[in-house]
Structure formats: structure tokens, C-alpha cells
Amino acid sequence: MKRTKKDIYKAYGIEFKGNKLYCDPLNMWINPLLTIGTNTKIGNAATWSIYHGNEMLNISDFGPKTAAIMAAANITEIKGSCPCHCDGCYCDSGRYCFDNVKAGNMLKLILARLYTDWTRRAISAQIEADDIMQIRIHAAGDFFSHEYVGMWYDIVSKFGKVIFWTYTKYEYALDKFETCLNFFITPSITPAGFNFGTCAELLYKYNKLTKLGYKVHICACGTTMQNHCADCKHGCKAVGIECDFVLFIKHSSRTYKAGKNDPIEFAAVCDIIAQQNN
């Protein structure tokens, strides 16, 4: 008999009712920790965000929702998650400025910093219960400690067919996840999505995904060094190509042109495209 979500969460020692989790550390009911969206092309995709920046965050600086979360944890201040605070950080503007978003990210920062084991169990239970197949870690925030990296290492290792990806400035994380085939980690240099990248980034992703047994198709439209095909995110599958992932060469920009900046990697990508079209 198929297990219910309640059964799965119970196996991880967490009470689940009405799509809410009972958070023992804070004595409150909360939403599942991963936000499920549609930003990828296979299965259920999810994101994990924690409060960004590297300054000390004080309860007096926040609105009522965020302040209530901090009060529930019996803290008046907590350090942000990033190794540094970048000029022009996108988390300083837009939707990240709404108090409900700040409250959600603060909640997860508190849980990750102070209650790491509970957070690991809650995330693991949700991956299993919601059949999540791809996770972007840190839509906001970054790795902040060896223990926190270890939490994600345990999760990534447990779910070997789930794809995890992120950007980071935390060097320990780059080394820790080196042997995890299902974890794609890039130094924080470009704000690209998982399916887009330079030729070198595409080769890295292509090799790891194929080793995991996924069928990967690289779209040829980027090899012309012109504009991508119309709606190329979905175009390849629309013409009947069956695959798990479609990868695309990064659009040409002022600083990057496929084939000019990276002729060796570009040639290797073109070879793969030629072979897949035979």
C-alpha cells in the first residue's frame, strides 16, 4: 500500500497535517520548507531560500511577521548567511523586501543555523513526500558553516537521483560536494539558470547528468552565434526529441561569445550535437 504524506513525515519524526508541519523547535505549525515551482523542464522542481547578507540582523529592523519568527526562537539578532554582502545583490530589492518573504527566509535561516537536524529531516521528508526531482539551493542566501554544508551533503547523498544545483562563494562547499554526481555547484560569477551556460559549463553538466543515467540533449541553436530559436526552452521537446534534460548555450553577450571565448569547449559541444543528431 502506498504511503501517505503523513506516513512519510512520521517516518522522519515530524507531524504533518493539512499540508503543514509541526515545528517542534519553535512550537508552531509551518509550511513545508521547500518552495515548489515550475522553473525547470522535468518533474517537480523546488527552491530553498534563507536570509541573505553577512551583517548581524536585529529584530528591531524587521516588520511584525519576521519579528514574530525571531521572538518564537527567543533571539533578538542573528547573522545573515552569506560569506560577504555583494553590491547590487538582487535580494535587496523586489519581492525579497516583502515582510512575508523576509519572514519565510528568516524562519529557514533560524532553523538551519540553530536546529540543523530537524531541518535536515523536514527537507528529506518533503523531497520524498512530494516526489521532488530538482532543487535549487539558495535562491537567496549561501552556505555559512561546515555543519550546514554537512546537512546538505547528507541530503544530496541520500537522494542520488535528485538534481541539486546552486552558486556559492563558500569555498569549503566547492570541495565537499566534488564527488557528488547529482550536485551541480558553481562559484558565484554568473546569474544563469541550470539549463543555460557557457560551453564549459554545459560540458560539465552534460558529463555529470549522463553519468547519472539521464538522457541529455544539447540544443544546436546556440552554435550559430546568433539568436536562439523561438521559445527554445521548449522547442526541442516540441519537435519530438525525447530526453530528460535540454541544455542551451548561453546567449552571446558583451563579455561572452560561444566559440570565440572558448574554442576548444565549443568544438566539443558541437561534436556532441553532431553525434546526437545522427
Which residues are covered by each model-predicted region?
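Class I S-adenosyl-L-methionine
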Residues: 1-278
